[in-house]
Amino acid sequence: MGGALIVLAMPKTIQFIKSAVLEKDFPVHKKAEVAIAGRSNAGKSSFINALTKNKIAKVSSTPGKTRLLNFFELDQSYVMVDMPGYGFAARSGDEMREWHRMIETYLMNREQLRGLLLVMDIRRSWTEDEELLKEFSERRGFPLAVVLTKADKMSRSQMLQAVAKVKKASGLSAVFGVSALKKEGQDAVEDYIYENWIKE
C-alpha cells in the first residue's frame, strides 16, 4: 500500500438487527462490533447518520432519549452498536445505575466488540465520565477512539487546538474532529474503523 490514502465506499446496506438491554437478549452472530458511546446531546445520532449516510439513529432535541443498545449491521461487514447517552442530569439514580450496569455488561463481556468510538461535543473538556469509558477499554483490552462533533462551531485552527487538547487529556492518539452539518471528517473515521478494527 505504501501509506497511500485508502478511500472506502460507504455501507451499501444497513439492517436494523434489534434493541436490547439484557445480555441474554444481545444478538447472536460472529461479525465484529463497533460500539458508539457519547454524552447526551453530544451529537452522537447526527454523527452516526452522517457516517452511514442513512438516518438510522433518531436525532432528538431531548437529551437521554436512547435507553437501549441498538444493533445495526452495516454492509454485511460489521455491526454498529448505538449505546445510550450518558451524563443526562434529569435521569434518576435508579436509571443511572441501570445505564451503568448495561454499559459495563456489554463492554466487559461482549466477545464481538472490536472497538469503541467515544463521541464528544468538541466544545467540551475530557471529564471523569469519559475517563470511566477509557478505563473499561483498558481493563478489557479493546481500542478506543474519540470523535469530536460539531467542528463547524469552530475555525479550523480552533478545531485543531481542541483535538490536541483532548489528545493530551486522554492520552489517546486517535482523536477526530467531525462536522455532520458540513459532512466533514466522517471518511477519516470510517477509514480508521475499517483499517484498524474490521479488516482481517
Swiss-Prot record:
Cysteine disulfide partners in this protein: none
InterPro entries: G_ENGB_dom (IPR030393), GTP-bd (IPR006073), GTP-bd_ribosome_bio_YsxC (IPR019987), P-loop_NTPase (IPR027417), Small_GTP-bd (IPR005225)
Domain EngB-type G residue range list: 30-199
Superkingdom to which the source organism belongs: Bacteria
Residues annotated for GTP binding in this entry: 38-45, 64-68, 82-85, 149-152, 178-180
Names of required cofactors: Mg(2+)
PROSITE patterns in the cross-refs: G_ENGB (PS51706)
Region forming the signal peptide: none
Keywords assigned: Cell cycle, Cell division, GTP-binding, Magnesium, Metal-binding, Nucleotide-binding, Septation
Any one Gene Ontology molecular-function term assigned to this protein's record: metal ion binding
CDD domains for the chain: YihA_EngB (cd01876)
Residues that coordinate or bind Mg(2+): 45, 66
HAMAP family assigned: GTPase_EngB
Family: Belongs to the TRAFAC class TrmE-Era-EngA-EngB-Septin-like GTPase superfamily. EngB GTPase family.
PANTHER family to which the protein is assigned, alphabetical: ENGB-TYPE G DOMAIN-CONTAINING PROTEIN, MSS1/TRME-RELATED GTP-BINDING PROTEIN
Name of the protein: Probable GTP-binding protein EngB
Organism of provenance: Bdellovibrio bacteriovorus (strain ATCC 15356 / DSM 50701 / NCIMB 9529 / HD100)
